Curated annotation (Swiss-Prot):
This is Probable 4-amino-4-deoxy-L-arabinose-phosphoundecaprenol flippase subunit ArnE. One of its GO terms (molecular function) is carbohydrate derivative transmembrane transporter activity. It comes from Salmonella typhi. It is found in: Cell inner membrane. One of its GO terms (biological process) is lipopolysaccharide biosynthetic process. It holds the Pfam family EamA.
Length: 111
């Protein structure tokens, strides 16, 4: 159960980061202020919810185990940037993602 909460906290944190990125995207038409407020508002909601879930995680897991699990954020952000904004991801970056996933699996088996 706490693993699910940890993944949700990670996804919400990443959602907040992605909303911040979207807030910086140029618009082809007017409404810049509305666009900015919408995405930054969503970012605050996501990050606030992530913080609440993170506090639940910290009540259960030692911080030395829980915190490295947030490395999942790097994986989610890489995948989202690649899919949503078609950002180029170099092979060495994918290797880094694979190493992060390996580390999470190793740490997760110790929890």
């Amino acid at each position: 159960m706490i693993g699910i909460v940890l993944v949700l906290a990670s996804l919400l944190s990443v959602g907040g980061q992605l909303c911040q990125k979207q807030a910086t995207r140029p618009l082809t038409t007017g409404g810049r202020r509305r666009h900015l407020m919408l995405w930054l508002g969503l970012a605050l909601i996501c990050m606030g919810a992530a913080m609440v879930l993170w506090l639940l995680v910290l009540q259960t897991l030692p911080v030395g185990i829980a915190y490295p699990m947030l490395s999942l954020n790097f994986v989610w952000v890489t995948l989202a940037a690649w899919k949503i904004w078609h950002e180029q991801v170099l092979p060495r970056h994918w290797l880094g993602v694979a190493l992060i996933i390996s580390g999470i699996i190793i740490l997760g088996s110790a929890a």
